[in-house]
């Protein structure tokens, strides 16, 4: 699933409260002007907020310390992060992006400091947790923020003359720092940020478990309401309403019949009819941590062709899971799933009809993050990694089948967050 790597975050400033997925991320199937009555089964849903434990200040301190260790290993004096997901990861603050530079510097040694437009300082200080560092260096509208970024790193101590830029930092900022601080080499900070964020703690996995549980609860409430003549938009709106009743922002992409063969759907309005394949791909987030679940069913009795392809897809998903062992490469998981589909006569590699994309992606604070089950990825499976497992069989002009469940790697190997579909008639295990 991908809408700009399907970021499960808003762009408004937030404090340590929950990030929330916007149902607009799935808006290609939703019609905000539709006011269909919400089915009673959805109205009866109760919030699933009890027992949610946010990430602690102590854990965020440990993340910063790990980032500083990785900077030393990578020979980086400090990294700059805009007010996006990595800012939330390390400090609990999400600011967003505009044409005005705002962000934070994590130095290899010393406390975090922030770079902020002067007129935004009061708002920034409302959101900043001073336990991580309370220094805010401000720039007026006619001044350069880039010298402030370099200045923080210089003042904390320079050893390698290298400044790391987090992957979401825009070019004009990185280039601005390069121009005002020519003595520094500008480098990629992904080995630091991904080196931290890829490996989830027990607390993070617990939050992801909740977001997956909520998604399944929403699906289980809504799927029985599917009927002949229902529009794609009505089904999508029902899913959004179910998430809301459960206390979360969420939604799903819905694609029907031949449009289910398009992995990320179509803008064409669709209506459900008896015998159609219906693919629902969506999720929510809990304290920012995402779920991503796909279920594919048929309204009414499936044809033998639909049943055979569904069962093949399930076999491919099972093969991927069976291939996941601590120490094996991520590409080997993709190979396992793809081999099942190819052996049934479907296209080699990414050719259609067949599996047109990787078998799975990393997931955490973003719906798509490091690392992927894909050819060429030699990253080794290790505890703390989290992935989607979603081989997909696309048959253009006919239909597509995708089953998607996310999983985490424990010390003893892989564990699904959700029960897999048992059959085309039993999508919830």
What does each model-identified segment do?
Residues 2-429:
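Active-site neighborhoods and metal-handling regions in enzymes and metal-associated proteins
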């Amino acid at each position: 699933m991908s809408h700009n790597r399907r970021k499960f975050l808003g762009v408004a400033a937030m404090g340590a409260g929950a990030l929330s997925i916007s149902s607009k991320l799935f808006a290609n199937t939703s019609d905000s002007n539709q006011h269909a009555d919400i089915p009673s089964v959805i109205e009866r849903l109760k919030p699933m907020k009890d027992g949610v434990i946010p990430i602690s200040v102590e854990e965020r301190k440990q993340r910063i310390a790990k980032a500083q260790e990785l900077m030393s290993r990578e020979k980086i004096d400090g990294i700059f992060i805009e007010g996006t997901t990595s800012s939330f990861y390390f400090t609990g603050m999400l600011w967003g992006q505009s044409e005005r530079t705002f962000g934070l510097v994590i130095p290899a040694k010393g406390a975090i400091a922030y770079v902020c437009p002067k007129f935004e300082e009061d708002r920034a200080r409302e959101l900043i947790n001073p336990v991580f560092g309370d220094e805010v260096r401000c720039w007026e509208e006619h001044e350069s923020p880039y010298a402030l970024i370099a200045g923080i790193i210089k003042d904390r101590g320079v050893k390698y003359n290298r400044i790391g830029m987090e992957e979401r930092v825009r070019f004009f900022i990185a280039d601005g720092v390069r121009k005002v601080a020519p003595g520094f080499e500008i480098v990629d900070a992904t080995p630091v940020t991904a080196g931290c964020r890829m490996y989830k703690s027990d607390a993070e996995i617990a939050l992801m478990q909740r977001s997956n549980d909520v998604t399944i609860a929403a699906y289980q409430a809504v799927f029985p309401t599917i009927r002949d003549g229902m529009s794609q938009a009505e089904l999508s709106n029902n899913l959004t309403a179910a998430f809301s009743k459960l206390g979360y922002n969420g939604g799903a992409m819905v694609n029907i019949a031949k449009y289910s063969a398009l992995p990320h759907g179509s803008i064409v309005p669709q209506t459900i009819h008896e015998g159609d394949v219906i693919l629902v791909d969506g999720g929510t987030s809990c304290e920012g941590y995402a779920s991503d679940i796909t279920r594919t069913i048929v309204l009414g009795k499936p044809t033998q062709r639909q049943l055979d392809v569904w069962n093949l897809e399930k076999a491919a998903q099972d093969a991927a899971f069976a291939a996941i062992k601590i120490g094996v490469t991520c590409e080997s998981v993709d190979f396992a799933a793809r081999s099942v589909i190819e052996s049934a006569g479907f296209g080699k590699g990414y050719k259609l009809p067949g599996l047109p994309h990787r078998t799975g992606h990393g997931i955490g604070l973003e719906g798509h993050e490091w690392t992927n089950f894909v050819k060429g990825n030699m990253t080794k499976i290790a505890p703390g990694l989290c992935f989607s497992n979603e081989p997909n069989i696309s048959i253009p002009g006919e239909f597509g089948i995708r089953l998607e469940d996310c999983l985490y790697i424990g010390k003893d190997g892989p564990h699904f967050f959700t029960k897999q579909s048992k059959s085309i008639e039993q999508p919830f295990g």
